[in-house]
Amino acid sequence: MKLGIQLYTVRDFLSQNMEDTISSLAKMGYQTVEHFGGFSCDADRLAEALSANNMSCVSWHAPLHYLENDLFFGTMAYFKRVGLKYCVFTVGPDIILDNEKRADLIKRMDAVQKALAPYGIKTGYHNHWWEFDQDALPFNDINKNTSLLMEFDTGNAMKNNWTLEKAAALYPGRQEILHIKPYSFEKEFNCDMGEDSVDWAAVKKVAREQNAQYLIFEHEDAPTAMQRAEKNIAMMKKLLL
């Protein structure tokens, strides 16, 4: 399993100096990154920074509309340049918790999945905690009505008392790429791996059973992001590899 980081974690540093941030993450031991949002960074510049540090951009949290209509081919050219393997969707509660809007979202994601497949890019869905509201109806609805990979976020799910073990038992074979986020019932997201409430031994077991390929660390605390990134990659190696 390769260790990566969601660049949202280091967003403040990334906006100040992308090249230095990528270099620092590589020195910590990260092998790949997951990007997010729009495509304000020049694709050549990003690809060159990653190549210079023997890193890759394995996945992207991309706004769905960038993969539709007139924006599709420009987005695909960008993805090809940076060598993307996974395109992952993440959606707010205003859509996820509305039955009609969620049904429309599922249709759109399914269409984009089919459009990306010929390019060799797999699609997935990244959960927050609101997918587990309403007795987990949104989470189950998405997984029952699509074949998207499940980029399961351990911390977000734990906030709503769900675990990777439970999710994988219901929907096996979808855990190629996982989000490794600590969460504590006492401190919420203000914690690190090994000081939190996530059962990392269970996560490791499921990751191996489901043949996970990428473990992507994410943290919410932007001001201490680089310290968190360094501390937690050491914990990922200790607890998950």
Residue ranges and their predicted role:
Residues 11-16, 34-45, 63-71, 94-100, ...:
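Acidic-and-aromatic substrate-binding clefts and catalytic sites of carbohydrate-active enzymes
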Residues 1-85, 149, 241:
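N-terminal pre-domain/capping segments
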Residues 183-191, 212-224:
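Active-site clefts of carbohydrate-active enzymes
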Residues 221-241:
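Aromatic-rich peripheral "rim/lid" segments of glycoside hydrolase catalytic domains that contact
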Residues 14-19, 44-51, 72-76, 102, ...:
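Distinct, well-ordered alpha-helical segments
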Residues 118-197:
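Acidic/histidine-rich catalytic cores of soluble enzymes
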